[in-house]
Design a protein with these regions (language model features):
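Short Cys/His-rich zinc-binding micro-motifs
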Residues: 1-17
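A structural boundary/capping signal
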Residues: 16, 22-223
């Protein structure tokens, strides 16, 4: 627990007594969200960006999703676009200090800054239905929210496996609609998950309208 004169754990640079002492910050997730708001001071639409980011994060934790970067990125992309935020849906190879080889992954970018929730519960090196590997805390505006500094993850790195990576090639040859429709755990695919999260955000979205609007979108390859 921070003392009154300690630096505030939200990362604002202010003393705790001058910042979040009267706010309920009891978990790492709360601290991450406070840091995201601090990072967003010069960002357009900061509140819907932060709220949507963490609504998707909380939903993925509640549903116990692992290795779900494409699903998480697709949902976040649609929610941000529906709130007037010019997000881009990216896929490519990334490199983590915790993994000795580059691997295919997807994420969202806004104004060329990375917003990535998928590495928090990544698939482990040896597949297991009950385990995951934490490669990074959520990355918001290029910032690792746990370290509160620029992420060490490298995005869009080259790879000799570009043509042979089955996961990458599959996603590149699908529309967003194909992927969202094929999600097996909701009767309306991932579109239903979008509507669930939108309701929590106070957004009124129509299932059929968003399907029609985004069904032909695709993941953009970043290299």
């Amino acid at each position: 627990m921070a003392e009154r004169n300690d630096p505030c754990p939200c990362g604002s640079g202010k003393k705790y007594k001058k910042c979040c002492i009267n706010k309920e910050i009891s978990t790492p997730f709360d601290i991450w969200k406070q840091r995201a708001f601090q990072i967003s001071t010069d960002v357009k639409h900061p509140e819907p960006l932060v709220d949507s980011f963490f609504a998707v994060f909380n939903h993925s934790i509640k549903k116990n999703w692992r290795g779900a970067c494409h699903a998480i990125s697709g949902i976040l992309y649609v929610l941000l676009r529906e709130q007037g935020i010019h997000a881009q849906l990216k896929v490519g190879f990334v490199k983590s200090p915790k993994v000795h080889f580059e691997f295919s992954h997807s994420w969202v970018e806004v104004d060329e800054k990375v917003y990535d929730l998928g590495l928090y519960r990544s698939n482990p090196p040896v597949a297991s239905p009950n385990e995951y590997q934490e490669l990074s805390a959520p990355i918001f505006h290029n910032i690792d929210l746990e370290a509160n500094m620029e992420t060490s993850i490298r995005y869009g790195v080259p790879s000799v496996r570009e043509k042979t990576d089955r996961n990458l090639q599959t996603i590149l040859n699908m529309t967003l609609g194909d992927y969202m429709n094929g999600w097996p755990n909701h009767k309306n695919g991932l579109w239903g998950e979008v509507i669930e999260i939108a309701d929590r955000l106070g957004l009124s979205l129509n299932l059929h309208e968003i399907k029609e609007k985004y069904t032909n979108e695709q993941f953009s390859f970043n290299s």
